[in-house]
Amino acid sequence: MNPSPLLDLIDSPQDLRRLDKKQLPRLAGELRAFLLESVGQTGGHFASNLGAVELTIALHYVYDTPEDKLVWDVGHQSYPHKILTGRKNQMHTMRQYGGLAGFPKRSESEYDAFGVGHSSTSIGAALGMAVADKQLGNNRRSVAIIGDGAMTAGQAFEALNCAGDMDVDLLVVLNDNEMSISPNVGALPKYLASNVVRDMHGLLSTVKAQTGKVLDKIPGAMEFAQKVEHKIKTLAEEAEHAKQSLSLFENFGFRYTGPVDGHNVENLVDVLKDLRSRKGPQLLHVITKKGNGYKLAENDPVKYHAVAKLPKEGAAQMPSEKEPKPVAKPTYTQVFGKWLCDRAAADERLIAITPAMREGSGLVEFEQRFPDRYFDVGIAEQHAVTFAGGLACEGMKPVVAIYSTFLQRAYDQLVHDIALQNLPVLFAVDRAGIVGADGPTHAGLYDLSFLRCIPNMIVAAPSDENECRLLLSTCYQADAPAAVRYPRGTGTGAPVSDGMETVEIGKGIIRREGGKTAFIAFGSMVAPALAVAGKLNATVADMRFVKPIDEELIVRLARSHDRIVTLEENAEQGGAGGAVLEVLAKHGICKPVLLLGVADTVTGHGDPKKLLDDLGLSAEAVERRVRAWLSDRDAAN
């Protein structure tokens, strides 16, 4: 670990505030080096944290946290915040089972004012805190720190619209690095990027580079030039306020300050001290560089948005992509990405839509091959779904590639704009089930429950890679809204067909014939069901569809077996197991049923296998639970 004499003194923001302002740049260097070491060993979100070091230091230096509230949007950039708030010695546990969460978490620290993981919530939450403090007579300050990527979401503008009309002391810090995970899209980033002050800063840098050597040789010339430079910057900022800022943020009722260099920590402190003394809604526009201080991340912030691990020797570079890699099973995301390109090559009506998740959803190749049919709508899940509905109305075949956890954000659009009109939109729902290190904010544990109650909706859950392709092809051709949900990571290693074969909608298959116990399994839980079935001599049904569910198969299994076990990687409440119980009740069948799913609890973060075992859904845990259930029933009889 690199020496960090200043950082070693800090266990809380109170310690930070004892430092002289002139020591803060050195502290920023130490903190950035610590991040390189810690994230290099544990993995995690990387480039965004490197870009937020100086801003985080300045905020905690000026604001009286935890009395004053810092609300981080998304939370990707919260590692420096955690280091400065007493968690430095726990950073080696980041995103690991039982360790620090990868996002701010209220139960983890009093400095984590609001739990996050999804984008664009910070302004609304900070506004709520500011209103509460005003009602209670507290002299606190609330600060929302939001990136320009998150600012593209409608929720952020809803909060701005509301806050600007209120007499509350609220600061919104717009951390503008021209990125979300991928480069930003839409009109707002272009608006911010066209900033006159940015152009002026670039001009000044050029002039300084070309004249600096000459001015150095003239006594007093450099000092005079610096004063002129400062005056030009001031005039440019004032002109910018009049020309652009007044037309957007100030018309929302915010007093605009900026743009400010987000890596000049001393100047940030001065600006924030001034803003803290002001009344009413304020917006500070800060310019930062994602990955700042680490050249590889600066040059490729998408690749370095999150990393697994970095080499130990100074965390100097990522492993070379030219090194030979063992042939691995394809991930479900890769299976989807290949299917999408194959399908698009055969059908010019196919349109792919993603809400700012090009890489994560497997759309990189599609964008390269079919740029005119690729739409990244930004962090705007609601718009993505309604946009797809409009396309479907005119005969196009939209495919919305979206994570399960983010589909929750567009529920009304699913119902109102798609299902009630029975529009044929295909939702490729990635990251269904447990996701691991990102924890409960990113777990896809509710989609079966909230999708199967929607009229007209087809809901499918593949058990392996080949079935994923089959169900994608099947649901794409359906004249109805459909969702195919699949987990993160690799599957079972099943060979994947290159064809476009389909299966009958609403029909499952028997994967194993057994004795008196029937396993009715959905999606990712088919594999553990098969692993256990041989030991318990159980029949295994791969249901494939949650809606329409295969009533005929369920009834046949219930009548030919003494006991039924349902298995799903989804919440038990309202899930696939509940659908099985509804079928049994409808047909007047009374048989013992054990529902195996995720209980009514908030899951943790860490290794997915460990989490599944804790939830009773690993193969070993399923065997234990079923054996105990069978034993209890035998004892009762």
From Swiss-Prot:
GO biological process, one term: thiamine biosynthetic process
Enzyme Commission no: 2.2.1.7
Cofactor(s) it depends on: Mg(2+); thiamine diphosphate
Residues that coordinate or bind thiamine diphosphate: H76, G117, H118, S119, G149, A150, N177, Y294, E381
Pathway where it operates: Metabolic intermediate biosynthesis; 1-deoxy-D-xylulose 5-phosphate biosynthesis; 1-deoxy-D-xylulose 5-phosphate from D-glyceraldehyde 3-phosphate and pyruvate: step 1/1
Catalytic activity: D-glyceraldehyde 3-phosphate + pyruvate + H(+) = 1-deoxy-D-xylulose 5-phosphate + CO2
One GO term describing the cellular component: cytosol
Transferase listed as a keyword: yes
Cofactor binding description: Binds 1 Mg(2+) ion per subunit.
Signal peptide (from-to): none
HAMAP family reported for this sequence: DXP_synth (MF_00315)
Function of the protein: Catalyzes the acyloin condensation reaction between C atoms 2 and 3 of pyruvate and glyceraldehyde 3-phosphate to yield 1-deoxy-D-xylulose-5-phosphate (DXP).
PANTHER family, per database record: 1-D-DEOXYXYLULOSE 5-PHOSPHATE SYNTHASE-RELATED, 1-DEOXY-D-XYLULOSE-5-PHOSPHATE SYNTHASE, CHLOROPLASTIC
Protein name: 1-deoxy-D-xylulose-5-phosphate synthase
Gene encoding the protein: dxs
